[in-house]
Amino acid sequence: MLSRNVYSRLSSVLFKTRYFSIACDHIGLNKLGINKPEVIHHNLSYPELLRHEQKNKEGTLMKCKYGDTFSIDTGKFTGRSPKDKWIVKQVDSESDSNIWWGNVNKPINPEIFEDLYTKAITHFNSLDECYVFDGFCGASSQSQKKVRFVHELAWQQHFVSNMFIRPKNKSELYNFRPDFTIINACSVVNQDWEKQGLNSEVAIAFNLEKKVAVILGTWYGGENKKGIFSLMNYWLPLEGTMSMHCSANVGQ
């Protein structure tokens, strides 16, 4: 049964520049501990993503009135899992004093995060290929952030390509240094959650000091988007800007 929660319009404005598949060290994945995948598909165009989605049998191409749509099944999660969202509480850090800790912003210690991070990295080091999207959140140059997503599924790259601002050309990717990276190991189930004192086998965990987050155990694409939006809601007020719950990836 096809899930109703992700319908990525292929009739969107196409990003026609082709970016070639590259190695881990070329874009700095090795600094995250990801060394194994021999092929990194970097900022693929929509037609290229569709070819990968179909080759990987990740969903179904549907003919719709307003253009072709690729429909996928996200499993048991058709929405976010807010009770599984965690933030590293680093004593005496900047984030420790700025975050409103409670039932929404729930703390975990750095050791638990490192365990979750290791599970994600170990998974990607077992793959032959993966997908990387580099882009921007926020249209204003004054508040715009560089974001990177590392995925095992082409459709999740498709999703973030729709949600975030794509680079206009290769020059914007030259020496790209993300302000934050999300590593989405959606197929990895955290079987140690009870021992760690977490809510379930799903984990969406952020380390603001290390500028990285990991997603485990949920295929729901919205966790990618909401993760960065949550970070913007943290960063922007500290920069003197009121944050709003809205976005656009195409002007006009």
Label for each model-derived stretch:
Residues 1-25:
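N-terminal mitochondrial targeting presequence
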Residues 21-251:
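A noncatalytic interaction/capping subdomain that flanks phosphate/NTP-handling catalytic cores
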